[in-house]
């Protein structure tokens, strides 16, 4: 499992940073990739990666500002050409209006998609758990931006314990169907009368990962709730320390506000994105240092960067 950032800039494309998009690679877990936001030029960014567009099966949109959605119709159209014979449907989750935005573009341009798009729209009254699979759950909660905007909390369900095959062999259990029974939690009685207690040979379940990905937002308690105990928090940092009033006026956060959210939520790692083009390299270093005075494990991400979870 890993996150790859396709665009880490704010507002409009810049030389060093494209606008918002990232993917959560779940290839080992689901053989899928989930995309979060799809700003202008996202499909061009994908060409610089190993991502196969047909593997992108779910797309989560935080809000309908252009720097988060204008790349979506183009990506969906190009995906049809890049999928070859292995066409896979796409589920799109997002605020009410995302279906109209996408379908108006598709119909007006005459694009033909050889796969189906399944839209899952919501408003402020219909949030909470928006998706559950056998391995993951996704929650959405309203943030505090200039338009309706959400953050997402991706929760991996706990992983089953693993079977200690060597310990079983040492206990005298021959390899075969009985191994499967023990793995499934069933006790087994050997020919000599010895009882193999399954739980003694299976490790404890492993806690699943929690990934929180926020859209644009002012500092708000909703961010803390979404991020509580997360392994990774992806938080915007459009402004820097000292610009709190400006950030609030425009519906955004500063680096230090993001750090306070991370600290309050007891997350393990904070990844800052949505970085304004006005910040130069020395500004970025200072932004990181200022945030680290509040929360230690802070990293300001770059376009195409991958973070393993």
Curated annotation (Swiss-Prot):
CDD domains: RNaseZ_ZiPD-like_MBL-fold. Keywords: Endonuclease, Hydrolase, Metal-binding, Nuclease, tRNA processing, Zinc. One of its GO terms (molecular function) is 3'-tRNA processing endoribonuclease activity. It is an enzyme of class 3 (hydrolase). Binds 2 Zn(2+) ions. Pfam families: Lactamase_B. The active site is at residue 67. Its EC number is 3.1.26.11. Zn(2+) 1 binds at residues 63, 65, 145, 216. The keyword Ribonucleoprotein does not apply. Zn(2+) 2 binds at residues 67-68, 216, 274. It catalyses: Endonucleolytic cleavage of RNA, removing extra 3' nucleotides from tRNA precursor, generating 3' termini of tRNAs. A 3'-hydroxy group is left at the tRNA terminus and a 5'-phosphoryl group is left at the trailer molecule. Its cofactor is Zn(2+). Belongs to the RNase Z family. Zinc phosphodiesterase, which displays some tRNA 3'-processing endonuclease activity. Probably involved in tRNA maturation, by removing a 3'-trailer from precursor tRNA. PANTHER family: ZINC PHOSPHODIESTERASE ELAC PROTEIN 1 (PTHR46018:SF2). Homodimer. This is Ribonuclease Z. The gene is rnz.
């Amino acid at each position: 499992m890993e996150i790859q950032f396709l665009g880490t800039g704010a507002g409009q494309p810049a030389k060093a940073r494209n606008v918002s998009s990232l993917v959560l690679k779940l290839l080992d877990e689901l053989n899928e990739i989930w995309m979060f936001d799809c700003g202008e030029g996202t499909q061009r960014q994908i060409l610089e990666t190993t991502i196969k567009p047909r593997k992108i099966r779910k797309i989560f949109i935080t809000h309908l500002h252009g720097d988060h959605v204008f790349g979506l119709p183009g990506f969906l159209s190009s995906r049809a050409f890049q999928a070859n014979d292995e066409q896979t449907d796409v589920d799109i989750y997002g605020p009410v209006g995302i279906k109209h935005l996408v379908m108006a573009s598709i119909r007006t341009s005459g694009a033909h998609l050889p796969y189906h798009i399944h839209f899952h729209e919501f408003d402020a009254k219909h949030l909470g758990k928006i998706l559950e699979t056998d391995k993951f759950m996704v929650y959405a909660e309203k943030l505090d931006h200039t338009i309706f905007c959400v953050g997402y909390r991706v929760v991996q369900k706990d992983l089953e314990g693993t079977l200690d095959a060597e310990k079983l062999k040492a206990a005298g259990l021959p390899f075969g169907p009985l191994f499967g029974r023990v793995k499934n939690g069933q006790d087994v009685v050997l020919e000599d009368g010895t009882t193999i207690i399954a739980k003694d040979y299976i490790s404890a379940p492993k806690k699943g990962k929690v990934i929180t990905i926020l859209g644009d937002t002012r500092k708000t308690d909703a961010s803390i709730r979404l991020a509580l105990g997360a392994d990774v928090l992806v938080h915007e940092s459009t402004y820097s320390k000292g610009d709190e009033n400006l950030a609030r006026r425009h519906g955004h956060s500063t680096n230090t506000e993001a750090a306070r959210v991370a600290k309050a939520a007891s997350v393990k790692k904070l990844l800052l994105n949505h970085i304004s083009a006005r910040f130069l390299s020395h500004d970025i270093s200072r932004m990181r240092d200022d945030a680290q005075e509040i929360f230690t494990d802070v990293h300001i991400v770059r376009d195409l960067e991958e973070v393993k979870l």
